[in-house]
Amino acid sequence: MSKQELEIKTYVSDLLQERAELFLVDIAFSGTHSRRKILVILDKDSGILIDECGEFSRALGNLIEENNLFGDNAYVLEVSSPGMDRPLLVSRQYKRRIGNTLSFLLNDGTQFDAVLESVSEEGVVVMPAPQKVKKSNKKEAVVDVAIEPRKLRFEEIKKCNLIVSFK
């Protein structure tokens, strides 16, 4: 990790301390030394507003400029909300999704959809969706099989996305 990346992470951390309702979802660096791209993804429990992203971007940009972090080199700073299509990465994101259907990919390769029932510091409890099974020569049918809630530790989850439904 470069000196600039460490400095930016420190700036983000300091700015978040002043804005306790916001939390960091992810920070990514890309580009070349002469043209860096910094992507900061923020959220809050009630959902972050575009104005809050803009205000945070201005504050972070001011710190970068005041400290002449990139000298004469160009950089692009983007501060964004996670968006509905991005994976859930931190436990606070899961709390907002209680009652929603999520798509899980576990570290062991298991994939399934489930309704998020609860969230703790260690992980989540989900209710898997009914399974589709074939009955003889008939088409697939959803069969009511006794499905039990399933506990997952965050360490077991490789990827988790919200399933967006427009019903």
Curated annotation (Swiss-Prot):
Gene3D superfamilies named among the record's database cross-references: RimP-like superfamily, N-terminal (3.30.300.70)
Cross-referenced Pfam families: RimP_N
Cellular localisation: Cytoplasm
CC per GO annotation: cytosol
SUPFAM superfamilies in the cross-refs: YhbC-like, N-terminal domain
HAMAP family: RimP (MF_01077)
Family, as annotated: Belongs to the RimP family.
PANTHER family: RIBOSOME MATURATION FACTOR RIMP
Protein name stated in the entry: Ribosome maturation factor RimP
Species of origin: Cytophaga hutchinsonii (strain ATCC 33406 / DSM 1761 / CIP 103989 / NBRC 15051 / NCIMB 9469 / D465)
